[in-house]
């Protein structure tokens, strides 16, 4: 299974060519879910008509082990802001969407999700172990294909994973929360 991502320049439009970055992940649940509505119409054969799809949602989560620089664009999208001198301020107004390709190379099955907004973001810093990141997505469209789209593919980051002892202090409003807060 592969996961690749690209920033969109036009919301909901897959970049062309689809130049993308491979992402390392521990779990990914992007999918399409649909809602069906039962028809109330009855025809002369006295049978109720079949249900129809009346809405679709494109959503899910991507979980990963933290790596320096590998998920900066997704964190910035969650903050609706840009990084400035290694500082990310949440609560901005900069809207950023992504196109994500999920691929199953063994069965030639590829799904491109577009118009993806990062709608949730979580950091898990365990007492022992690797730091985990979770990004929730809501999107506008999914297309399927038997072959991967054309475009340059950048390999996943080779930076080391981060643990609770391999990073400095986590600051909230410029103050360390080490030993005093659960976020």
Describe the function of each predicted region:
Residues 1-183:
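Signature of extracytoplasmic/envelope-associated structural regions
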